[in-house]
Amino acid sequence: RQRQMCIRDRRMMDACADFGRAVVVLDRPNPNGSYIDGPVLDMKYKSGVGALPIPVVHGLTMGEIARMAVGEGWAKPCDLTVVKCRNYTHATEYLLPVAPSPNLPTARAVYLYAALCPFEGTVVSLGRGTDKPFEMYGHPDMTGRTFSFTPRPTAGAKHPPLEGRLCRGVDLSGMPLAEAREVGFSLRYVIDACADLEMGDKFFTPMFEKLVGVGWVREMILAGASEAEIR
């Protein structure tokens, strides 16, 4: 849900409806399209990183989201055509032939995105400014960690969080792809970092609620709840 493509598509559909233009979506597979996970967006947290009331991992293709947006009234009625993908089902294991973003350079990063994206709403780095963004996390004050990295300016992150500071944390880049594909919207990593840093509410920023889509996840993490209890 946090990726901005579906938000831009909905805005384009609204603009086409206003000007009487047809919309044609050439559909593509979703590499995380085999499951649904995470909270449905509470629309009071609607923002540029979440504008539709769908789960964090929605499992839909762009064409399916476009149809749903029109059908549910989330987008203005428009002349919509979706050109379907041949031989694709939601059980298809699909590896993207081209990286969708400089910050999602590998299949592992794509699979771990849902679990690591909430760090964008915390003081922790998720590896922007390294060669393995979304495959690690860390902070200068994390303790008892042997892995370290230092964020530097890159093509995909000119001024990454914690730029130039040595961060200690966790390296997930060696996780087998099959295991990474099963992680889903896991809060285990955020809970781990929050407990380690012992910063209380200062661990989070207002962006956290916009990313997870609800207000009670932060509260439960700070109360010491486990991932299973939060789910």
Residue ranges of model-derived segments:
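Active-site-proximal beta-strand/loop segments in catalytic clefts of secreted hydrolases
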Residues: 1, 26-29, 85-86, 139, ...
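Short, small-residue-biased leader/transition segments that mark boundaries at the very start
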Residues: 2-7
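A short helix->loop->beta-strand "cap" motif at the edges of active sites that frequently abuts
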Residues: 18-22
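Glycine-rich, charge-decorated loop segments at or immediately adjacent to ligand/cofactor-binding or catalytic sites
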Residues: 24-46
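Structural recognition of the beta-strand scaffold that forms the well-ordered cores
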Residues: 24-25, 82, 135
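Conserved anion/nucleotide-ligand pocket segment
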Residues: 45-116
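Glycine-rich, aromatic-lined ligand/substrate-binding cores of catalytic
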Residues: 87-163
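Conserved functional hotspot residues or short segments at active or partner-binding sites
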Residues: 133-231
